């Protein structure tokens, strides 16, 4: 049976039901594992899957046209021990062989870890239907990516992730059964502008919408921004479309923030603190 995720209000299987049926919590580990462990490494992805949640992978292409998982444009932050001749060079200008020599694990612990190819990640997902992954798009040829996904039989395990609705529509035309996430950051004005645009386009192809939640302005009496009333209104609108509403509390580590969001009705998170988020989520859901 094949389910298509059209992002409209029609009868369809909700992403949260897909996850629940496979014993996966609707929680995204930002950049693969949050701030606790290395970013975008295969070891991190596996650890996150074993926690029962979903890693995010950032994808780029090397000079020899291999898709790799890495967030930054160069190795300066993630592999600070890189030689001076390479540290500021874009990954798009170095080969896979060179990229594989970089240690992207030690900046966050003692472990030495390398940059994985997307092919390596996909191989680790094949045969494991509970291993989902958010693929945060960064200038990858969509036809090539779609072919890779189909070759590995991962059409329903990939969550195509971007802030550009037109890219989700393009992706959905290639793999209509794929999940997707549109993330919305920046100012409240930008959030409103983005919602107006996707509303005009009938939320086409979107199965999850993520809003970034941040600390309030100093003069504000609200617990976070956007304010709870605005979040609830957008959540209601999104849910009516059969779309999963997700929030990313940006660098917010206070447990009470997550509890307040759950009390508002939020049922999906992206987080830099997955262990804490899992604990709060499970305890809250057991209490209701």
Go through each PLM region and give its residues.
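Bacterial N-terminal signal peptides
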Residues: 1-4
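Phosphate-group recognition and catalysis centered on beta-loop-alpha active-site segments
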Residues: 7-288
């Amino acid at each position: 049976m094949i389910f298509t995720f059209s992002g409209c209000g029609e009868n369809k299987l909700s992403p949260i039901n897909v996850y629940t049926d496979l014993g996966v919590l609707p929680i995204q580990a930002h950049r693969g594992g949050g701030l606790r462990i290395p970013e975008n490494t295969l070891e991190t992805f596996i650890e996150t899957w074993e926690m029962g949640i979903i890693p995010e992978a950032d994808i780029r292409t090397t000079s020899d046209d291999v898709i790799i998982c890495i967030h930054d444009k160069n190795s300066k932050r993630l592999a600070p021990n890189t030689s001076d001749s390479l540290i500021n060079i874009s990954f798009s200008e170095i080969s896979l062989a060179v990229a594989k020599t970089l240690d992207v694990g030690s900046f966050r612990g003692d472990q030495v870890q390398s940059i994985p190819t997307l092919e390596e990640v996909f191989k680790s997902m094949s045969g494991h239907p509970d291993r989902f992954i958010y693929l945060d798009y960064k200038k990858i040829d969509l036809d090539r990516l779609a072919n890779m996904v189909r070759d590995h039989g991962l059409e329903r395990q990939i969550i195509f992730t971007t802030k550009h609705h037109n890219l989700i529509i393009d992706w959905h035309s290639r793999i209509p059964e794929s999940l997707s996430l549109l993330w919305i950051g920046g100012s409240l004005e930008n959030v409103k502008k983005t919602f107006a645009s996707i509303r005009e386009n009938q939320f086409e192809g979107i199965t999850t919408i993520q809003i970034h939640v941040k600390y309030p302005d100093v003069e504000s009496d609200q617990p976070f921004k956007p304010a709870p009333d605005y979040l609830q209104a957008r959540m209601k609108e999104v849910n009516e479309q059969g779309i999963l509403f997700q929030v990313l509390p940006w660098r917010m580590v206070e447990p009470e923030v997550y509890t307040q969001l759950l009390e508002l009705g939020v049922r999906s998170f992206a987080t830099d603190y997955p262990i804490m988020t899992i604990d709060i989520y499970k305890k809250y859901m057991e209490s209701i």
